[in-house]
C-alpha cells in the first residue's frame, strides 16, 4: 500500500468517526458529556487537516 493511499484511508476513517461522534454529540447536547464529545471532534478536525496537508 502506498503512502498516499494509506493517508487517504486514514482520512476516510477519521471522517467516519467524526460523523459518528457528531451524531452522538446531538444526543448529549446540554449535558456534561457535550464538552467531551466536542473536544474529540475538534481533535479529529485537526487530524484530518494534518493528514490532508500530507497529500
Residues of each region from the PLM?
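Repeat-based scaffolding regions
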Residues: 4-7
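Short, charge-rich amphipathic interface segments used for partner binding and complex assembly
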Residues: 10-55
